[in-house]
Amino acid sequence: MDFDFVFYGAGISAKIAAVSLLKEGFKVCIIQDKKESSQNSNLVTFLSEGSINYLTTLISNPANIKTYTTIQKLNCSLANSTGSKEEFIEFTDNKSDALGKIIPNNILESMFDEELSKLKNITIIKDETPIKINDASMNVEIFMESKNSIRAKVFILSSSNNDEMNKNLNIKFVSHDFNQIALSVRVIGQGQSEGCAYQKFSSDGPIAFLPYEKNEASVVWSVRDDSPLVSMNKSDLEKIINKKLNSFCRPLEIVDIEKYKLKFSFSRKLYSNKTVLIGNIAHNIHPIAGQGLNLSIKDISLFVKFVKNYKSIGYEINSSFIFEDYDVERKVDNTVYSFGTLALEEILSTQNKLVNAVSRKGISYLQKNNFMKKLFVGSATGKKYFNSL
């Protein structure tokens, strides 16, 4: 079987990229990773306003996205290691009153599964695992465990679960273990202000309240591996979360709890020969800034733009010029957000009194500096980036 693009991995990023390429008339195959998590996860994603605008061009019923709560404000606080008053900072977008939306991952996946089911030229393989690729010739040949093989002009790797395949890439990765577990807690309840997300930084780790429907929200708390919170029962954890967030939220009731190991990974290049990286394998960052999927959507939109533009002037869709331009154009943004969140998590969760005092002064300064806050919001919402495509 021959395709224009073959994906290994069927996560949200892969499905978004596949739909985008299919709508440009390309023939696409998705090989589903057997280790990928079920759609029943309670995880949520913050989608910036720019990402939402892009995604609504890809799906038949964009109203499905618009039903979720619009986030108009993000309030952050930094606890004082000495126990005195917290420092606060508020981010808003005064031009549009919208920073983005928080949407459950399973809803996003369902939207793009539905879109894939409506499109032609899509093949989904569920019972195979690629074990080797040969991308040194004009096309890429992908060899399966079953000894079958398929060919494509471009192989897109969006799964990080196949160590053997990753080793064969001519790409270096930067890795870091946060020694943290993310507690993803689905709750019933509301914040004190409608359309406002909250994040609190303390020595226990960053905790965020992320509302996505009128009376439903997610609490994400990144705690150390050895924290007693990891094994705490629902009732006791509910009491602690309510105490932690009582200045931001009305009483919250826990529905369910999931736990995820947090690790950092950053690819120094986004391609190797005719293999392209998209999604978490390209940059798996701390959830502290809520930018993980937004970075991937920026990657996807630019990659598809380059493929379309180069093809229109006679280049093959696996031309090295496409891959080089894609890598160079996305380098700065991906590096800044990936390593910026790595440093930010270390600084804001520290128990060092001097670092905490300096951080508090920095937050106090930033709260008073509307110009700096405007720059931050402009970058986080991504609207300028998507408008430039």
Residue ranges and their predicted role:
Residues 1, 57, 68-168, 176-181:
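Conserved N-terminal helical subregion
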Residues 305-389:
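C-terminal helical "tail/cap" subdomain of flavin- and related membrane-associated enzymes
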Residues 46-49, 93-114, 228-235, 262, ...:
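Short beta-strand to alpha-helix junction loop
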Residues 4-6, 10-72, 106:
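Glycine-rich FAD cofactor-binding loop and adjacent beta-loop-alpha segment at the N-terminus
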Residues 55, 154-250, 254-257:
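Conserved FAD-binding catalytic core of PHBH/FMO-like flavoproteins
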Residues 229-313, 317-321:
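FAD/FMN-dependent oxidoreductases across multiple families
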